[in-house]
């Protein structure tokens, strides 16, 4: 028997958060799904945030410190997200680190489940190690980064799902993600236009045109409507002027006969 050749697939070694984002969408919008291309773009945004926060956390470390801790990640995320988003994000990150610390001794479940997060803590730690410039990363720092990514992506998923629902769609597309970020000033300030490699769809609001008077077509212009024929005027019956007896006496016989004929009188003989 001839042996069948086994085809092997090269494993993608790049970090992605597709699984966690699917789980987040199921919680935020249970009745809406996401297209494969849109899910890849969402994962790219999450990786972009992880890299930016990792670089920021390293710059905030004191001199001589070789370990990235949760405090540095908190400061970097708050600085990247701005005033409003940063305040809420830091609160969620602190809660996640606290939950993980209380459930750390338990051997059951992953680090993400202990912190009650959908974004993978292990993949967030990998981003910190690869792009943070430090080989030492504390467990709290990885949890804080995962919580920071999850908070921001939760905002994006909520707005993108609303945009899909407004468009009467049941699947989120790249266009809905673009629309969600462009219409929110805080999200757009963080992400901007540089992430949408597969989309690049710029939606411009166009006012609804007003209804204009109907224009005549060339066919209608070439054959104008026929004018209605004027109504025929009824011929007014001429009233014959009747003569007095004195005037009749002056008439000759021929004139009198003519007059009587016009008046419809029988001739007098």
From Swiss-Prot:
GO molecular function (one): structural constituent of chromatin
One GO BP annotation of this record: chromosome condensation
Gene Ontology cellular-component annotations: host cell cytoplasm; host cell nucleus; virion component
Region Disordered, residue ranges: 210-249
Disulfide bond residue pairs: none
Gene3D superfamilies per record: Histone, subunit A
UniProt induction comment: Expression of viral histones begins 2-4 hpi and continues along the infectious cycle.
Record keywords: DNA condensation, Host cytoplasm, Host nucleus, Virion
Listed Basic residues bias regions: 224-241
Main location: host cell
UniProt subcellular location: Host nucleus; Host cytoplasm; Virion
Role summary: Histone-like protein that is recruited to viral factories during viral replication and participates in viral DNA packaging and virion production probably by forming unstable nucleosome-like particles. May compact the viral DNA.
PANTHER family from the UniProt entry: HISTONE H2A
This protein's domain notes: The N-terminus is similar to eukaryotic H2B, whereas the central region is similar to eukaryotic H2A.
Name used for this protein in its record: Histone doublet H2B-H2A
UniProt source species: Melbournevirus (MelV)
């Amino acid at each position: 028997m001839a042996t069948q050749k086994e085809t092997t697939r090269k494993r993608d070694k790049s970090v992605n958060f597709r699984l966690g984002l699917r789980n987040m969408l199921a919680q935020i919008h249970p009745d809406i799904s996401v297209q494969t291309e849109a899910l890849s773009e969402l994962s790219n945004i999450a990786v972009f945030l992880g890299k930016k926060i990792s670089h920021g956390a390293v710059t905030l470390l004191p001199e001589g410190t070789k370990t990235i801790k949760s405090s540095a990640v908190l400061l970097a995320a708050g600085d990247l997200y701005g005033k409003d988003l940063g305040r809420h994000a830091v609160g969620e990150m602190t809660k996640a680190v606290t939950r993980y610390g209380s459930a750390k001794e338990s051997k059951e479940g992953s680090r993400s489940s202990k912190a009650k997060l959908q974004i993978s803590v292990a993949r967030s730690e990998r981003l910190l190690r690869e792009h943070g410039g430090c080989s030492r990363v504390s467990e709290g720092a990885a949890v804080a980064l995962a919580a920071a990514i999850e908070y921001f992506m939760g905002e994006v998923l909520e707005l993108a799902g609303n945009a899909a629902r407004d468009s009467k769609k049941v699947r989120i597309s790249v266009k809905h993600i673009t629309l969600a970020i462009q219409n929110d000033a805080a999200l757009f300030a963080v992400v901007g236009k540089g992430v949408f490699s597969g989309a690049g769809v710029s939606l411009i609001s166009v006012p609804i045109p007003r209804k204009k008077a109907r224009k005549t077509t060339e066919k209608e212009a070439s054959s104008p409507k026929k004018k209605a024929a004027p109504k025929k005027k009824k011929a007014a019956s001429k009233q014959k002027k009747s003569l007095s007896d004195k005037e009749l006496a002056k008439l000759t016989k021929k004139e009198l006969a003519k007059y009587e004929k016009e008046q419809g009188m029988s001739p007098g003989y």
